[in-house]
């Protein structure tokens, strides 16, 4: 039986090889996974042209996935450096990578990225439009925007971020409800500017059926971008954000009718007390589609530490329904991240994702923690290092401050609770004062 997309196959009762791979990774029955894909509750982004892909599922009941952003810019046009970042993301087992390149001719980098990457690849075609055509933004036609999107999927992008919900109605709501930070989405601001400069409707909204044609042809997932995500805590959960989310819910159903998979993108900056509500609103308005969030960043006062502010928000968001976390690095709001920034951002986001999986009861999530607890009780340092989310750092810290006793560290020495409880329960002397063990 033939099928066009993962969703089309699922609706027809066909188990694809991608479904089989994802089900095995998630320790779940493939028929259960197929049912979730058929209903849009799980997306498996898998472009037919991405030959090196090791597919992952995003959505209900699955492990929380993370995305790494990278790409070339006008001030940092170094393809080799960005390819080093790609390898770093792959080595650290990020499930997805987004190419946010926004200057010049980006196709060479994009092709090399897709060819070398087993991770899911996402792109934002509007970032590429000015460089692709060597034209000012206002002079690009609606048809040309669609052609850029098609070029990206021909190259093998598994999902496209398109800010389709920034239509005239959303723009009108934005104008009537002033914000402290206006629109902080790069793609959203470009589309809003194009609409204002040309007095026209969002080309991706106006020609949404043509966009769906492209996605269906290549089995590309639509990541419906949040142009009105809050850029500061003062702007969170406002009229513009909710108006756009309503539009995204309507667009989701249109995409599903065409068997195109959908991911919904979300905030942004917001205080801790608003996160759970926002997750529930998205799941309600967007019919249970997978939710992809940036952070949320829970305070605006921590430049240089936004990997922490976002990990706090991300853990809460994923606990209450977010399925996909975009990493944030210490360089956020300051500069393009380097390799060290990347590492910190990936680790912080992976911690948030795993913490949420524990809270959600994702199958197998506790196994890792239970193994670490056993290694700690056994004072098996080598095993602890192997299980650490950052093995290199754990080893380095231990090496930098060595205890005299092999079964303790320099925090407690022979007063180590674990050491002493082990000895007492085994009927051994604590041997607190003598240097020998």
Curated annotation (Swiss-Prot):
Is the keyword Magnesium in the record?
Answer: no
User: A GO term (biological process) for this protein?
Assistant: thiamine diphosphate biosynthetic process
Q: Which residues bind substrate?
A: 69, 98, 127, 163, 185-187, 226-229, 265, 292
**Assigned keywords, A-Z:** 4Fe-4S, Iron, Iron-sulfur, Lyase, Metal-binding, S-adenosyl-L-methionine, Thiamine biosynthesis, Zinc
Q: In which pathway does it act?
A: Cofactor biosynthesis; thiamine diphosphate biosynthesis
Q: Which cofactor does it need?
A: [4Fe-4S] cluster
Give a short account of what the protein does: Catalyzes the synthesis of the hydroxymethylpyrimidine phosphate (HMP-P) moiety of thiamine from aminoimidazole ribotide (AIR) in a radical S-adenosyl-L-methionine (SAM)-dependent reaction.
Kindly provide the name given to this protein in its UniProt entry. Answer: Phosphomethylpyrimidine synthase
| Gene that produces this protein | thiC
């Amino acid at each position: 039986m033939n099928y066009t997309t993962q969703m089309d196959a699922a609706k027809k009762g066909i188990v694809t090889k991608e479904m089989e791979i994802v089900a095995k990774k998630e320790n779940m029955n493939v028929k259960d996974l197929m049912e979730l894909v058929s209903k849009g509750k799980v997306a498996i982004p898998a472009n037919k042209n991405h030959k090196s892909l090791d597919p992952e599922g995003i959505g209900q009941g699955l492990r929380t996935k993370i995305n790494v952003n990278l790409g070339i810019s006008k001030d940092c046009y170094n393809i080799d450096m960005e390819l080093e970042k790609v390898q770093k993301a792959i080595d650290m087992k990020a499930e997805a990578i987004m190419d946010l390149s926004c200057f010049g001719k980006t196709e060479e980098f994009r092709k090399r990225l897709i060819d070398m990457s087993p991770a899911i690849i996402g792109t934002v075609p509007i970032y590429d439009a000015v460089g692709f055509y060597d034209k000012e933004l206002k002079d690009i036609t609606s048809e040309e925007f669609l052609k850029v999107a098609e070029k990206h999927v021909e190259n093998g992008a598994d999902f496209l971020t398109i800010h389709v919900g920034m239509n005239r109605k959303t723009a009108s709501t934005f104008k009537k409800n002033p914000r402290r930070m206006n629109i902080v989405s790069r793609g959203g601001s470009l589309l809003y500017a194009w609409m204002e400069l040309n007095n026209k409707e969002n080309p991706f909204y106006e020609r949404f059926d043509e966009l769906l044609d492209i996605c269906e042809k290549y089995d590309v997932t639509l990541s419906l971008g949040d142009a009105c995500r809050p850029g500061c805590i003062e702007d969170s959960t406002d009229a513009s954000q909710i108006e756009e989310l309503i539009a995204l819910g309507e667009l989701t159903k249109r995409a599903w009718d065409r068997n195109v998979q959908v991911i919904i993108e979300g905030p942004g900056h917001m205080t801790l007390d608003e996160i759970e509500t926002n997750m529930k609103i998205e799941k309600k308005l967007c019919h249970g589609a997978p939710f992809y969030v940036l952070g949320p960043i829970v305070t605006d006062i921590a430049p240089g530490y936004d990997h922490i502010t976002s990990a706090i928000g991300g853990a809460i968001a994923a606990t209450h329904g977010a399925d996909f976390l975009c990493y944030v690095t210490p360089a956020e709001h300051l500069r393009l991240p380097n390799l060290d920034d990347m590492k910190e951002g990936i680790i912080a986001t992976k911690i948030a994702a795993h913490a949420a999986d524990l809270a959600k009861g994702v199958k197998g999530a506790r196994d890792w923690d239970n193994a670490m607890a056993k290694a700690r009780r056994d004072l098996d340092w080598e095993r602890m290092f192997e299980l650490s989310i950052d093995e290199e750092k754990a080893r380095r810290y231990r090496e930098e401050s060595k205890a005299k006793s092999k079964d303790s560290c320099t925090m407690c020495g022979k007063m180590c609770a674990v050491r002493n409880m082990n000895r007492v329960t085994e009927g051994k002397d604590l041997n607190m004062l003598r240097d020998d063990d």
